């Protein structure tokens, strides 16, 4: 069976770590810069797409041919990015992920770490981190760089050649790892689960973007309101500071080692007046959390969906899925009777009404 090993280097103005590969590749600024590949045991070649080279017909045909196995370390990244580049969805059928194969054996989840554990000869090049930062991410505009916000190959041809070598080496490292693990193939049952996982992530979840943005806005307004009242009562420069609040309380005869929820509630039972109100405000300032909404805002794609919420074998010692981006598996159960009313209140930023 023919195998095509792939590694790509890309550019996007979206943060891959914070937003995931789907939003990363969905950006209008997204590009594939380099495409390194090797069929079976053939030497690895690299296509310099950034400098105008195009993918050979043989590679394009293989990408569409389910009988040819496409492999990569973290194949979801390559498949998603190449789908975006080609302008059509590539099914996970015919793709295998060497990272998943490594995780099945409780090996690390990164190419360089697996290479170290298996002591492969052609390890991932350490300088790659700096090269990726230089070419694959926006740069800060300075007088020295002429005010540009991105580095192109012509800005450092020598680095660009090293970047191409780095891309080739990633294919070589992935192939060597795969050969070392060939006695431990991914079982068919696990491959079926992997393809289901990829389908789930490709499909994503539709989100109510109006509700999300309104929830974040409400949180900002609510925090400002609560903090303003805390400033008014305490006169502190930062009423969110535990040290300042402890000192303020001590001046009023209230001593405490901690300001966690349990301690504050205990103090509330013993105080009144301004001290009681400040303690209530302390709880309110720590109460609301819209981190999931903020993660949705960062990660939502142009189709109104958030993709890539699960990582197959993310917990590689147990084989469990791991949540990514929004951590949907940690959403609390919802028992609000008038949920639709609550949603409308949030959408309209009716803080006082919804708080009541």
Segments predicted by a language model, with ranges:
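Conserved "right-hand" nucleotidyltransferase catalytic core of DNA-directed polymerases
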Residues: 1-10, 14, 27, 34-36, ...
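Active-site-proximal helix-loop-helix substrate-binding element of RNase H-like nuclease domains
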Residues: 30-37, 41-182, 337
